[in-house]
Every structure is written in C-alpha cells, then in structure tokens.
Amino acid sequence: ELLAKQQPQIRLLSAAGEQALQECGLGYRTRYVLHAAQQAAEGTLDLKKLASLPDEALFARLMELDGVGKKVANCVCLFGYGRVGRVPVDVWIERLIRDEFAGQDPFPQFGLEAGIVQQYLFFYKRSVG
C-alpha cells in the first residue's frame, strides 16, 4: 500500500519501518532505502542541494551513502537528476561491451549524451541477448 499509487513522500518512507518496505519488495535494499530516507527527512541528506552539484561531485556524494555502488550512483544521476552523460554499467552493458564492442567502452565518444545512448543499447542487448 505504501507504493501502490505514487512515489511516497520522504517523511512517509522514513517513518514506514522495515516491515512496510520489505512488503514493497525491496529485499536486501530495505535498510539502505530506509536509512537514506531517514537522512533526507532529518536534513542530513539534502536531495535538492544534490541537484546543484556538478556531475562528479553528485556521483561522489551518492557513493558515500550506505548500499550505493557505482551502478546505483550512476542510475540516480541519470534517472533521478537528469545527468544524461552518466552511464550505469550492469551485466547487460558489460555483455554489450564485450560482445558488440570487442571489450572497448564505446560510451566516451557520446559525451554528454552517453546515458541516453546507453539506454538504447541496454534495451537492444536485453531484447537480442
């Protein structure tokens, strides 16, 4: 019910507790999401202030959060903050680089649009295997 109709407000997430978040299907991510929501609700993690950071500083700050690695930080940069130059690398992108680009990372050539290109290539690789 917490996520049934819309994205919940930070204060609702932070007060929900682990059980409610587990029921949303977050699995092992539950405590990380809860902790980040609590930090945001308390003001120690200012999500709006993050938006004003340059790409690399935003990425670095996200990497400081518990449970956040390179892929998740890049996903948040790309999808949450519209930083279209960020390229999340998961198993599908690793396979794509290996199979279609002989192990050479193709994304630097796309510059500030690399994240958009990544999405097209991600869906391509997922559909053809």
Q: In which residue ranges do the predicted regions lie?
A:
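HhH-family (HhH-GPD) DNA N-glycosylase catalytic core used in base-excision repair
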Residues: 1-129
